[in-house]
């Protein structure tokens, strides 16, 4: 059994770690609230944009934009949103597993995949497994802006415009609540028809100003950007929630470990005292 001094050292070490994880839990809780506010503020715009685009997909358009037309699939692209930091449980790996399963399904059909990464954890993971990373952005911090995302989005849209991609998806964690974050893969292009039953029963027509091509070119790009940005802010809220839960679990586990070590320490101290008493009694008997 380890000596009492060594056990006391271990207890002190765990207590110090527990203080760190408790502080990180509190910081994550504060950041999560701010991330939720940012996510809630951007959701109405993203949802409304999705509805407008859903109208377009079900509409009788006088100009058929390339983003609305299905193609034979030879190569697909993914805009993958991950975190820049760790200590957030299985948030990233669950997302990566889901994406790898879908990429394997495409590969089995002879379809290749390109990846545009948002977040350093995704970059390091997919570089390690041999993914074809064509664009990346990292270090956006806790308050990302749309301008920081333009690079990867532009690369993927250009590839789609040039016919080098036939489908485009955004991959991120959807924030449900503090205890639940769901990895999601959402098709961006070609524009999926709305699943709203009311929209399917209606026939939509539009008047365009100045002209359909100019308007749709801008609107559809804004749609892609808005969905990617929403994925980023949802993923950020998911990250802080997962980190808060992970740090709380670490703090609680630290408390349990301290109790176990305290019990071992008490036993070691008791054994030491018993041994000393035995030696004293033995010495007295010898005299």
UniProtKB/Swiss-Prot annotation:
CDD domains attached to this UniProt entry: F1-ATPase_gamma
GO molecular function, one term: proton-transporting ATP synthase activity, rotational mechanism
Subunit structure: F-type ATPases have 2 components, CF(1) - the catalytic core - and CF(0) - the membrane proton channel. CF(1) has five subunits: alpha(3), beta(3), gamma(1), delta(1), epsilon(1). CF(0) has three main subunits: a, b and c.
Membership in a protein family: Belongs to the ATPase gamma chain family.
Entry-linked Gene3D superfamilies: 3.40.1380.10, ATP synthase, gamma subunit, helix hairpin domain
Domain of life: Bacteria
Keywords assigned: ATP synthesis, Cell inner membrane, Cell membrane, CF(1), Hydrogen ion transport, Ion transport, Membrane, Transport
Function of the molecule: Produces ATP from ADP in the presence of a proton gradient across the membrane. The gamma chain is believed to be important in regulating ATPase activity and the flow of protons through the CF(0) complex.
UniProt topology in membrane: Peripheral membrane protein
A GO term from the CC aspect: proton-transporting ATP synthase complex
Localization of this protein: Cell inner membrane
InterPro entries tied to this protein: ATP_synth_F1_ATPase_gsu (IPR035968), ATP_synth_F1_gsu (IPR000131), ATP_synth_F1_gsu_CS (IPR023632)
Entry-linked HAMAP family: ATP_synth_gamma_bact
Name this polypeptide is given: ATP synthase gamma chain
Classification of source organism: Bacteria, Pseudomonadati, Pseudomonadota, Gammaproteobacteria, Enterobacterales
GO biological process: proton motive force-driven plasma membrane ATP synthesis
């Amino acid at each position: 059994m380890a000596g009492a001094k060594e056990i006391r050292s271990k207890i002190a070490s765990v207590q110090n770690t527990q203080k760190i994880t408790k502080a990180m839990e509190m910081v994550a809780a504060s950041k999560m609230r701010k991330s939720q506010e940012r996510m809630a503020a951007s959701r109405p715009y993203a949802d409304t944009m999705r509805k407008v685009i859903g109208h377009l997909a079900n509409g009788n358009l006088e100009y058929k934009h390339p983003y609305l037309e299905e193609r034979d699939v030879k190569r697909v692209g993914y805009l993958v949103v991950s975190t820049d930091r760790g200590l957030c449980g299985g948030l990233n790996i669950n997302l990566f597993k889901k994406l790898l399963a879908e990429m394997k399904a495409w590969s089995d059909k002879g379809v290749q995949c390109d990846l545009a990464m948002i977040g350093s954890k995704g970059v390091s993971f997919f570089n390690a497994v041999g993914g074809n990373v064509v664009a990346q952005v990292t270090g956006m911090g806790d308050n990302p802006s749309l301008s920081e995302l333009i690079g990867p989005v532009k690369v993927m849209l250009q590839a789609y415009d040039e016919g080098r991609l036939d489908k485009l998806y955004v991959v991120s964690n959807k924030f449900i609540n503090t205890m639940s974050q769901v990895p999601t893969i959402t098709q961006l292009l070609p524009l999926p028809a709305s699943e709203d039953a009311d929209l399917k029963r209606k026939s939509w027509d539009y008047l365009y100003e100045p002209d359909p091509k100019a308007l749709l070119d801008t609107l559809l790009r804004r749609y892609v950007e808005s969905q990617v940005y929403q994925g980023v802010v949802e993923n950020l809220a998911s990250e802080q929630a997962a980190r808060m839960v992970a740090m709380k679990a670490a703090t609680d586990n630290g408390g349990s470990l301290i109790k176990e070590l305290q019990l071992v320490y008490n036993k070691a101290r008791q054994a030491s005292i018993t041994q000393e008493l035995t030696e004293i009694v033995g010495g007295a008997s010898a005299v």
